[in-house]
Design a protein with these regions (language model features):
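N-terminal active-site segment of His-dependent metallophosphoesterases
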Residues: 1-47, 52
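Residue-level marker for buried hydrophobic side chains located in beta-strands
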Residues: 4, 28-30, 59-60, 139, ...
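Short, glycine/acidic-enriched loop or turn micro-motifs at the edges of active sites
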Residues: 9-10, 36, 66, 145, ...
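Active-site neighborhood of divalent metal-dependent phosphoester bond hydrolases
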Residues: 38, 42-45, 49-130, 165-169
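Acidic, His/Gly-enriched loop-helix segments that form or flank divalent-metal centers
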Residues: 95-196, 200-206, 212-228, 232-234
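A short C-terminal boundary segment appended to hydrolase-like catalytic domains
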Residues: 239-252
Length: 252
């Protein structure tokens, strides 16, 4: 088994329940956004790092990790060069991260700034990669495959920030499909060759899990404050490309 999980946003309870559902030899891929917004970013990161270091989890970078790690990197460069431009860039990235849900992580760690990002988080960031090449030519990344959407400025930023409505995206010749998180939807959804898995776990208590080998989909349903039926569904201009993924629901 090779199971892909989307955004967790501090839902360590859902991650733990999902991991326990599968046999001990199961391999996992996490699509990024472990931190921010939810109740236990710290515990989520610890679990992911433990699984990674045990050789069971491939960790991908999400836009929430990217905001904080780039703030920390600019702060490091400011210290090394005494360049005010780096200092300002660090403050801007850090403020953007806080506006996008980072205050929950600040509270968990008792507060910090770009110069003092906790070692736990930096060690987690050091294990992240941007994409994963799975079996059968299936590519995994946080938000989109490695393509350039001009308004995001670079391929890397597109992979971290793009939305389904920015696509469908051209895939590399050897890639048959791609799997992503990032955009919360009411149900796992295909748009052309792209599968979107994020069900807004931190709000809905729903975490999808897609097996890249058997193509089985499970939704682990825990406690949430918002029914996932209230999340958006993709419609309109891409209707001929959109189809939902059949899944089994497991209450946790």
């Amino acid at each position: 088994m090779l199971i892909v999980f989307p955004d967790l946003h501090g839902r360590s309870d859902l991650l733990e329940a999902a991991i326990q559902h599968y046999p001990q030899d199961t391999q996992f891929v996490f699509l990024g956004d472990a931190i921010d917004r939810g109740p236990d970013s710290r515990g989520t990161v610890r679990q992911l790092v433990e699984l990674h270091d045990a050789g069971r989890m491939t960790l991908l970078c999400g836009n929430h990790e990217w905001m904080l790690l780039t703030a920390a990197e600019f702060a490091r460069q400011a210290q090394e060069t005494d360049d005010e431009a780096y200092h300002q860039a660090a403050l801007e990235r850090f403020a953007n991260w806080e506006r996008n849900g980072g205050t929950s992580v600040q509270e968990e760690f008792g507060g910090f700034n770009p110069d003092t990002v906790p070692t736990e988080l930096l060690e987690y960031f050091s294990r992240l990669q941007l994409l994963f090449d799975g079996p059968g030519g299936v590519l995994c990344s946080h938000a989109a495959p490695p393509a350039l959407v001009q308004r995001y400025g670079s391929v890397e930023e597109t992979m971290l920030w793009a939305r389904p409505n920015d696509g469908p995206f051209a895939l590399p010749s050897e890639v048959t499909a791609s799997v992503h998180g990032h955009t919360p939807l009411a149900q796992p959804t295909w748009v052309g060759q792209h599968l979107y898995l994020d069900l807004g776990a931190f709000l809905t208590g729903a975490l999808s899990a897609f097996d890249l080998e058997s193509l089985e989909m499970i939704v682990f349903q825990g406690q949430g404050s918002v029914p996932r039926e209230h999340l958006p569904e993709l419609r309109s201009g891409q209707s001929n490309l959109i189809r939902t993924q059949t899944c089994t629901v497991v209450e946790v």
